[in-house]
Amino acid sequence: MAILLRDLYKETKSTYGLDLIAGEEGLDHLMNWVYISEDPGTLEFLHGGELIITTGVLCGNEYWLYNFIKGLIEHKTCGLIINIGGHLNRSDISDRIRMLCDRKHYPLFLMPWETRIFDITHDYYNRIFDDTQTSQAISTALSRVILHPNDKALMEISQPVLYEHGFQVDAQYHLVYISDLRDTASMKPTAAQTNTSIQQSEHSTISSGYANTAGSFLQNLLTRLVRIYNLPYTFVNGTDYTLLISPARSNERLEQELTRLLYYMGESAGTTSMYIGISAPTKDLIGLSQAFLQGRCAALMAQKKNSSLFFFDDMGFYKLLLSVSDMDVLREYVNDTLGSIITYDEQHHTNYLETLYQYLLCDGSIQKIAGALFCHRNTVNYRVRILREDLHLALDDPSTRFELMTAFQVHSYLDLFS
C-alpha cells in the first residue's frame, strides 16, 4: 500500500523541521518508499511513488539541481526533501526551481542539517511497513470471508483481525466491484463461474497488494482518491478487479461517491473505461461472499448497458436467476421453451424468435410490432400465424406467454455471461 504525502507531512513536519516551499498542490500524492539519491544516474532505478531525500553533495550549480528535480518529476517520484545547511542552502533554491515544482505539483521540502537522515528514513520505513502490514492483514481477512465463509477455522483467524479494525460481524456492508482497470473485456466470467460457489470459481484471484498488476497506476490513483476524500472504503484487489467494501449506506450516497471517483479518475488518467457493480446491502459480514457475486453480476450488466455503474438492486428478474447454481437447468428451460423456434429460424434463415419477443413486449399489438420490427403489418400477421399454426404456440394463453417471456429473460441472462 502507500501513505498520503499530506498526512505524512502533517504528522512529521515538526519532528524533522520540514518546510514545504513549493508544489503544495501535489501533497495528495501517495508515498510508497523513501529513497536517498545524490546522483541523477540512479534515477533509472526508481519505480515511481518514492519520496526522495538529497543533500546535494554533487550539486555544482543551479542548473544541476533544476535538471535533477526535473528528472525526479519525469520518473514520477512523489516529492523531494533537500537536506540544507551542508552542501546546499535555502538561497540555492531558485525561483525557477520553485516555479517548476509549483507548475508540476511536485512537493519540495527543506530539512535542516541538524535532522539526521537516518532518523527520518527509519521513521518513514516503519510507517510504510506498518501501513502495508495492516492493509495486507485486513485484505487477507476479508478475502477469507469472501472466499471461505463456511470455513470455521479461517473465520476464527480472520474475524478478530477485522474486529480490531472496526468491522462487526452483525453489521451490514456494501461491496463495490470494479472491473479490471486494464481491460474491461477480461472481467467477463462464464455463467458457471459466476453462479457456482465462489470457493470453486475464484479461489486464486484475490490478492492483498498492487504488485504485479498492469493496472496498478489506476488502482493507486483510486486508492489516492479514496484517501483524499476520506471515504470509508476498504480495498481488496484481485487479478482482474478491485473490490471496495464499506458500511451499508443509501444507494444515492454510493452513486454520488462513485460517480465522483469515476470523474476524477477520468480527469487524472484520461480514462473512465471501467464498469462498477454495487451489491445489495449484506445482512452481516459473512454475506460479503454473496455480495461478491452480486457486485460482479451488476458490473457485467453495467458493461452490457454501456453504463459506468449499476446496482444489483436494479437487476430485477436476474436477481432470482443468480441464486440458481445449476446453469444446465436454465439452459434446458430455454431449450424446452424456445428451442423449436430457434431451430426453425436456423433451418429457414428466418427470425421468428425476434417476432415472438416483440409480440410479447407489445402485448400482441400488430401495429406496435410492425413499428418495432420496421416491417409491414401484413408481414407481422403472416409471422404470427406461423408462430401459432406451424410452431404451435398458444399465444392467447396467459400461462404460455408468461413462460415464453421468462425463457427470454433466462436467455438474456445466459447471454450476459457467454
Q: Positions of the model-derived regions?
A:
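Gly/Thr-rich phosphate-binding loop signature of adenosyl cofactor/nucleotide-binding cores
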Residues: 1-73
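Short acidic, S/G/P-rich loop/turn micro-motifs used as interaction or catalytic elements
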Residues: 57-61, 85-89, 182-185, 249-252
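Hydrophobic/aromatic ligand-binding patch that stacks against planar heteroaromatic rings
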Residues: 71, 100, 301
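Long, charge-dense
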Residues: 100-146
